[in-house]
């Protein structure tokens, strides 16, 4: 291809950089990497390691700075032949308007749904969904944001889920006893609380959490979410998950698909027919069976549909 501009987000500052550099270099290309403004150090260290290992200097350049300065210059430069971007939908749309006739790969956001059927193994489903919702403080494009639970087990699932969430220890993330640390900055924490408050004003119920101290937002569980509010249809990118009661698998799938995102979906069930029905009808790039949406290994295909990727 030639020169590839790789632009990465803050939430996985080493893994996502490696994802872009490895295939590009293996394919015989040179890369100009623009890591996230707030998390550049791991990218710089990885670049140092690659150079020390013998990578030719002109194969990789790392440029740090603000996206609206460095990123705009990179994506509009005619010498760059491909853009590889991971980040938010709005930033992705802005890049698309500036790149001209270049190849492009985009991994964007999501609002990941999980379906919990009444024939599932409830305990592991609860544990997996709690972990999937609050891992990385919810700052994860495949983190669990919506859970559609069959009405037969809704109350039991809810009680176990809320109880397990309340057990989470929050605080300094380098403390080994901490389950969940702060968000990337206080500005984002304020935004998350604003979305929660807006949902409550519209009739949603906050079962636990919903508060913050500085950039630390307590893990939050919601229910009775009105359709169309931000928490229902947009990507929160924070430690907030909403529970929904459904009567059938088809109802769960229909509601799962009723957003403009489609990265990962998941279903908990012991019925293989339910699993294959979800695989066929959920409008997402990947479906996880009997684990949460927050599952990905580096060797598996990964990508989304609708506003989740290109």
Language-model-detected regions and their locations in the chain:
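Short, solvent-exposed beta-strand edge segments and adjacent coil->beta transition regions
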Residues: 2-3, 111, 142-144, 177-179, ...
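Residues that line or immediately flank small-molecule/substrate-binding pockets and catalytic motifs
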Residues: 8, 87, 151, 270, ...
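ALDH superfamily catalytic-core signature
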Residues: 54, 82, 90-226, 249-250, ...
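Conserved C-terminal structural/oligomerization subdomain of aldehyde/semialdehyde dehydrogenase
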Residues: 80, 115, 166-169, 196, ...
